[in-house]
Amino acid sequence: MKKLQYKDGKIFENERMTYKLEGKYNVLRPSGKLVARFKIKNLFSLRGKKQAVIGNLKIEKMKDEPISQAKIINRQVRLIENGENLSLIKEDEFLANFNFGENTLEIYEDEGLAVAIFFALKKLGEK
């Protein structure tokens, strides 16, 4: 398990930067290597609904709802709220735990996907 901390658009592990958000939607390693790219869309058919797209994964959230109410539209990946945390689960395998109150991530598997989803959720949570 890795414990990571989010600060100012960057993710740190033990005070060392491990990921950063470049521009609005590119998740990079400090070396500049692209980890993931996502897009944020406003869904016009439903006012106030935003969608983040990472490959074939779609995350939807209403503007006035908290991040914990976000839903992943994919058969294999799910977000489950447990107390203050959001758990990321893929095919019954626990991938990560996000705490948006403390801006922390606990990553167990598939680090690149978990970090990209965390950044997308942070962007969806912005007003």
What is the predicted role of each segment?
Residues 1-127:
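Intrinsically disordered, low-complexity proline/glycine-rich segments
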